[in-house]
């Protein structure tokens, strides 16, 4: 008798991988549309570049490994990986940046460990961290959101900036944001201002903030929240990791905010800034690299929320989502080992 050996998780819900990945990609659409509305067509161009590169890279690796190409490409996992990476990088980043990140995510992080179901780390976040460490200037040059940008960025301008076409030789002109500096995200601005001795209230007076939230970023996170709730409704993901992240981040931020509101932002600011909601529902919930038991998923999510807060508040990077997810990925086997449900029998009476 022949037995088929497959990768974990071994619990089947009757939904094919391609269907799950397609639903995840579809639920990203609200966030993609809002992100494009506020930050221009660069996000869509980066998305197309990442998807094309990811599929091409996966096809080449599958051919080299002697694996079926078309069947594997149809599982849509490369689509989700490419989308998450593209949505995490600046819209006007040079074209080669997303190409390098996509190839690294697919070839090194995913297929070097055996392909889908065998990778230890989230491919999109691993690709993002490699780009952030290798090219920090390009990875932190965001455009100003619509409404406060000195220069609007239409589709043609975005293409010129991304592909370095025309006399501008890149996107420096289009990256000019508020106060004559290259665009700083709300998290960047808060961290910089606090290091200069300003209070959060003084920082919130800047044009990049709309009240207590960053212009554009609140709505982007709200859109990803809406897409994430649909994923929960469709039972594509379970609630444990998402709740763990949000609860831990809320509790940690609440302590800091209550103790010193002049030097700590509110929990809701943490929730609706940077890539929080994208990570909460679309990145951290990757079943391959996360903990598997319900209690383990809660611990896994809580660890991500705590790490996000610690790095954002005390670390050198303003948005810590990628680092938090990768560190939690490292701990997932440890969590699964010590937080295992009692499958058979019961605890003996003392």
UniProtKB/Swiss-Prot annotation:
Co-factor requirement: FMN
Entry EC number(s): 7.-.-.-
EC category name: translocase
Localization annotation: Cell inner membrane
Residue(s) carrying FMN phosphoryl threonine: 185
UniProt xrefs under Pfam families: NQR2_RnfD_RnfE
GO biological process entries: electron transport chain; transmembrane transport
Chain ranges passing through the membrane: 25-45, 89-109, 124-144, 212-232, 239-259, 265-285, 298-318, 319-339
Topology class, membrane: Multi-pass membrane protein
A GO cellular component annotation in the UniProt record: plasma membrane
Alphabetized UniProt keyword annotations: Cell inner membrane, Cell membrane, Electron transport, Flavoprotein, FMN, Membrane, Phosphoprotein, Translocase, Transmembrane, Transmembrane helix, Transport
Annotated function: Part of a membrane-bound complex that couples electron transfer with translocation of ions across the membrane.
Family: Belongs to the NqrB/RnfD family.
Subunit structure: The complex is composed of six subunits: RnfA, RnfB, RnfC, RnfD, RnfE and RnfG.
Protein's name in the database: Ion-translocating oxidoreductase complex subunit D
Source species of the chain: Shewanella denitrificans (strain OS217 / ATCC BAA-1090 / DSM 15013)
Organism lineage string: Bacteria, Pseudomonadati, Pseudomonadota, Gammaproteobacteria, Alteromonadales
């Amino acid at each position: 008798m022949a037995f088929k050996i497959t990768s974990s998780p071994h619990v089947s819900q009757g939904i094919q991988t391609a269907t799950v990945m397609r639903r995840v990609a579809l639920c990203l659409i609200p966030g993609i549309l809002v992100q494009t509305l506020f930050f221009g067509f660069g996000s869509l161009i980066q998305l197309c570049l990442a998807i094309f590169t990811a599929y091409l890279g996966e096809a080449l690796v599958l051919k080299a490994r002697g694996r079926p190409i078309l069947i594997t490409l149809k599982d849509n996992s490369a689509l989700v990986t490419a989308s998450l990476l593209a949505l995490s990088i600046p819209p006007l980043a040079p074209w080669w940046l997303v190409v390098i990140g996509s190839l690294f995510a697919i070839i090194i992080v995913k297929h070097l460990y055996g392909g889908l179901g065998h990778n230890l780390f989230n491919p999109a976040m691993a690709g993002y961290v490699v780009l952030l460490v290798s090219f920090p200037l390009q990875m932190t040059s965001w455009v100003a959101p619509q409404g406060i940008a000195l220069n609007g960025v239409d589709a043609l301008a975005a293409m010129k900036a991304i592909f370095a076409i025309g006399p501008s030789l890149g996107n420096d002109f289009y990256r000019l944001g508020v106060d004559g500096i290259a665009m700083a995200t709300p998290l960047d601005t808060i961290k910089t201002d606090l290091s200069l001795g300003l209070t959060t209230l003084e920082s919130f007076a800047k044009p990049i903030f709309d009240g207590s939230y960053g212009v554009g970023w609140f709505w982007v996170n709200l859109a990803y929240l809406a897409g994430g709730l649909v994923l929960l409704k469709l039972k594509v993901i379970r609630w444990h990791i998402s709740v763990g992240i949000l609860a831990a981040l809320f509790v940690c931020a609440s302590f800091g905010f209550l103790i010193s509101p002049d030097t700590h932002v509110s929990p809701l600011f943490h929730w609706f800034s940077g890539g929080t909601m994208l990570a909460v529902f679309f990145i951290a919930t990757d079943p391959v690299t996360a903990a598997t038991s319900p209690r383990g998923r809660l611990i896994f999510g809580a660890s991500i929320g705590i790490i996000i807060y610690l790095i954002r508040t005390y670390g050198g990077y303003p948005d810590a989502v990628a680092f938090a997810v990768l560190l939690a990925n490292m701990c997932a086997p440890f969590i699964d080992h010590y937080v295992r449900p009692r499958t058979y029998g019961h605890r003996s009476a003392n």
